[in-house]
Structure formats: structure tokens, C-alpha cells
Amino acid sequence: MSTAGPRAGSAPGRVPTGGAALREALVALQRDLAIDEATVRRIVEGAVVDTYRRLVADDPEVQARVDLGAGSVGLFRDDGRGGSAPVEAPVADFARQAAQAAKAAVAGWAREAERERVIREGMAQKGELIDVLVERLDGALWWVRAGNLAALLPPEEQTPGEQLQRQQHLKVVVIDVRRRQRDAVVVVSRTHPSLLRRLLEQEVPELADGRVLVKAVAREAGRRSKVAVHAPEAGIDAQGACIGPRGVRIRAVVSELGEEQVQVVEWSADPAEYVASALAPAQVSAVELDNETRTAHAVVPDDQLSLAIGRSGENARLAARLTGWRIDISGESGHPRRETATSPAPEGEDAG
């Protein structure tokens, strides 16, 4: 389609761009992406001018005017008398290239707008619990959706052994928004400590209103977790509130986590008491602290030693992560110590 000269019945300078088709495309973009008319006009006009300067002449005074009703664009420049003079584009195939550039510009704007929307909505929900629908598996990656927000559940954030199914509903916590060159993706987790924290807040009114606080969470997702809780005001049983009458509240949380064992312990400002509490269900006879190395030596009855350590060191390891202390455990009769190293608490876990 050439614009080497004015077409019969057309105004000089008019760039034909497929009329009805362009008009329908622009209307659809405005509807689906909520692009206002002024923005569409600005994007299309800029793309047409850029095409003219690239193919015809680098004239800084050339401007474009889009007619959304007709689905066409006109080129003009200031005539110096307060009016405008039409500008021809005497290049074969200019109209097609201008139309392609306009559509590409709108698509690029829409892509960037979508990227910013994902970033904005994802950041607003970071750390929050959301309900999602499992949509599809892409290799080891699960894609899930919450309303109009698609999210990624990568392998490292999937609970070991948990088998997901398409169209399955589940709860996840938003942990990140990854900015990529052309888009952005929200990352969610089933293993992050914040998931357990948010699930408890959902089930325990005393947590939701601040009468009970979650001070720390340590998880080995799919297997076992420990949660340290505290009630700032006297007279409130923080541990009992989280467990609920006959364990109904904690069972609701466990059922969402695929039968992961969740143990609620009392937090204490006294590190020795806190370490003893964190080693439950084992009974602890005494705890000695080395503040310089931040090491706690716990002494337990001989028949409690295996329980304090746990299978493959699991109980002691979680207690160390929960408290932020390195914990050595020995029996009362002087059994060799079990050393349990601890590293800084992962994101979302507070040593309290």
C-alpha cells in the first residue's frame, strides 16, 4: 500500500492503516488492558513519526495525528501560520510499516504495563498468604493462579514428596517478584516459614489481633516444624491458643501442610528457658550458656537423650534454628555431647 501521492477521496497526508481492523484492535486493547484513549493515541502517533523519520526524513517538525474512529493516522507539520500542513510519505510500503510499528509499540507498552502490574501486585502481597489454583506443570515448575495473577512455584519452594494435581486448590505464600527483561513473575512457596506463620494467623484469632505473637518459626517442610509463641499480656496461654480446643486449630494448619508435624513451644526472653522449651518434647534438666560463642549446653535425663536429639538430629537441629543458639546436648550420666550447629536464621525465621 503506497502513499506516494494522495489517494482519491482521502485527505492529503493520510496514512491508511487498515481502518476497521486497526480500530477494532485499538478498542480491544483499551478494553482488555485498560489503556485510555489518550495513551493509545500517544503511542500510535509516536510510532508513526518514528517510522517516517527512519524511512523518509529525519524531520523533527513532523507530527502525527491518529483518528481512532477511522482507524487511520495523518502526518503533518506546523505551517507557520497557526495551522498545519499535510506531509506526504513518498515511500513504497510506508503505510504497512507504519501500521506494524504502531501495533508493535502498543504491544510493547502493554507488555511493560503488564510487567509493572505484576511487580506492583506481587510486591503488595509479598509475605502474604494467598489461595491459588494449580494450572500447569512446566518441567519441574508448577504454574499457579490467583485471580488475574499468575505465579511460579519452583522446585526449591515445593514441599518434598507433595504431589500436586492440575486444578487443585492450595495455599501458598508470596516470597518474591523476579524482574526479567521482558516481563516479571511472582514466586510463591510451600516451604517458607512464613507459610506456617500465616496459616496459624488464619486459624488463631489471638494471633490475628496481636494478643499472641509468633516469635520464631523453623521448618523442615513436609516433615516437622517448630513455632515459638508468646503472649505479652499475663493470663493468656499462647501455646494453648495456637493448639486450640482438643487441638482443632493446629490440626487445621497441619492438614494444609500435608500432615507435616507442627510443634508449638513457649518463647522466653531468658535464653536458657527458651532453649529448654525448644527442645520439647524432651525434658531438659539444665541449660548452661556460653554467651561468647552463643552456645547452649543442655543436659537431659539419659532416657530423654534420643528424644532431645531426634531422628537424624531433627529435633535438636530445629531447636537450634528456632533459638539462634548452637546447642550441645548430653545425658545426665555424662554421655558424649551431641553438637548441633546453627547458622543465622533463614529469611522469615526470627530467633526471638
Protein language model features and the residues they cover:
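RNA-contacting regions in translation and RNA-metabolism proteins
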Residues: 1-352
